[in-house]
Swiss-Prot record:
Belongs to the AdoMet synthase family. The lineage of its organism: Bacteria, Pseudomonadati, Pseudomonadota, Gammaproteobacteria, Thiotrichales. This is S-adenosylmethionine synthase. Pfam families: S-AdoMet_synt_C, S-AdoMet_synt_M, S-AdoMet_synt_N. Catalyzes the formation of S-adenosylmethionine (AdoMet) from methionine and ATP. The overall synthetic reaction is composed of two sequential steps, AdoMet formation and the subsequent tripolyphosphate hydrolysis which occurs prior to release of AdoMet from the enzyme. It catalyses: L-methionine + ATP + H2O = S-adenosyl-L-methionine + phosphate + diphosphate. Its main location: cytoplasm.
Length: 386
């Protein structure tokens, strides 16, 4: 790749139909974990006009009122009137949950957490870069900020004409592999009938874009596409069917890193799609925070029923202060990559997952997000002798 280029990432709001589905799946997981930390949960959700379908495999001693919980999440997300796309108070809720296969359980459940086998085969990636304060790629970082500000102004009533469904996209111009300025911002937001397109355009730029995008990244040539198709009244599940796990690039690094293909929401941490990806981020972030590289990508892979990974790979894209093979060795010595130890060390059996389902699983330094800690950075730096 040339050192001078444009790079684009997108984010979506919590009211986007796919994100509504993710929230429902993770809310169900959280409620189960409150009662049963040993539960096995794989919960998928589909939302469409007037209905929500919950399906998957759950094995647990917990009891939760799934219908009530689904309705609660839909209303809390802002869908409390059918003219917004769905009304959580009146929509149909269909429950098609079954139990986890006993064939899978016999390979995964081994008694002690330390011996826990991976819930499936798969490959996961973690990534970090020193482009932003949270060590996330710039385009996804700013896309998430735009969507969080849209939600903030909608909920506070500051921009009372906003509705829940929205998307943002940011294109960064890179020079010598470093982000220099924003070339293009795209933001589409659902709204009610009371706002004109001109007033909406001006308000989005003044009250959303300028509140979160640093002025030094905006130039006279920065292009804005605000609701570029015009009116956006029909949104949410009425406009598009929503499905769990369909925004995996929004959930991770905005396309700036590889993705193993597995979604996160609705899965308990015995599923390495989730826990392995969280561990990958934890490793990559600590490597960059330690100053061992400007950019780091980690791949781990697992076999179903096997506790240890079948492979580990570290790539610093030529930015490493020591060789990638040396960093890989330090990672192996510093981090325990057995599935059960990942769950234990990152404390993943807590009901924290609905918070992850919006605005990215990575790059938000919340107390619950243990994979965002940089508590291993000093150890890595000391061991690397740099």
């Amino acid at each position: 790749m040339s050192k001078n280029y444009l790079f684009t990432s997108e984010s979506v709001s919590e009211g986007h139909p796919d994100k509504l589905a993710d929230q429902i799946s993770d809310a169900i997981l959280d409620e189960i974990l409150k009662q049963d930390k040993n539960a096995r949960v794989a919960c998928e959700t589909l939302v469409k006009t007037g209905m929500a379908l919950v399906a998957g495999e759950i094995t647990t001693s917990a009891w939760i009122d799934i219908e009530e919980l689904v309705r609660k999440v839909i209303v809390e997300t802002g869908y409390d009137n059918a003219n917004k796309g769905i009304d959580g108070r009146t929509c149909s809720v269909i429950n098609a949950i079954g139990k986890q296969s006993s064939d899978i359980a016999q390979g995964v459940d081994r008694g002690s957490l330390e011996d826990l086998g991976a819930g499936d085969q798969g490959l996961m990636f973690g990534f970090a870069t020193n482009e932003t304060p949270t060590l996330m790629p710039s385009a996804i970082y700013y896309s998430h900020l735009l969507m969080r500000k849209q939600a903030e102004h909608r909920k506070s009533g500051k921009l009372g004409w906003l509705r829940p469904d929205a998307k943002a996209q940011v294109t960064l111009a890179y020079e010598n592999d470093k982000p220099k300025f924003i070339d293009t911002i795209v933001l589409s937001t659902q709204h009610n009938e009371s706002i004109s397109q001109k007033d909406l355009h001006d308000a989005v730029i003044e009250e959303i874009v300028k509140e979160v995008i640093p002025a030094e990244l905006i130039t006279k040539d920065t292009k804005y596409h605000i609701n570029p198709t015009g009116v956006f009244l029909i949104g949410g599940p009425q406009g598009d069917c929503g499905l769990t796990g369909r925004k995996i690039i929004v959930d991770t690094y905005g396309g700036a890193a590889h993705h193993g293909g597995g979604a996160f929401s609705g899965k308990d941490p015995s599923k390495v799609d989730r826990s392995g990806a969280y561990m990958g981020r934890y490793i990559a972030k600590n490597v960059v925070a330690a100053g061992l590289a400007d950019k780091c990508e980690v791949q781990v892979a697992y076999a179903i029923g096997v506790a240890k990974p079948v492979s580990l790979m570290v790539n610093t894209f030529g930015t490493g202060k020591i060789s990638d093979s040396k960093i890989e060795k330090l990672v192996s010595e510093t981090f325990d990559l057995r599935v059960g130890k990942i769950i234990e060390n990152l404390d993943l059996l807590r009901p924290i997952y609905r918070k992850t389902s919006n605005y990215g699983h990575f790059g938000r330094e919340l107390p619950e997000f243990t994979w965002e800690k940089i508590d291993k950075a000093d150890n890595l730096k000391s061991a690397a002798k740099i």
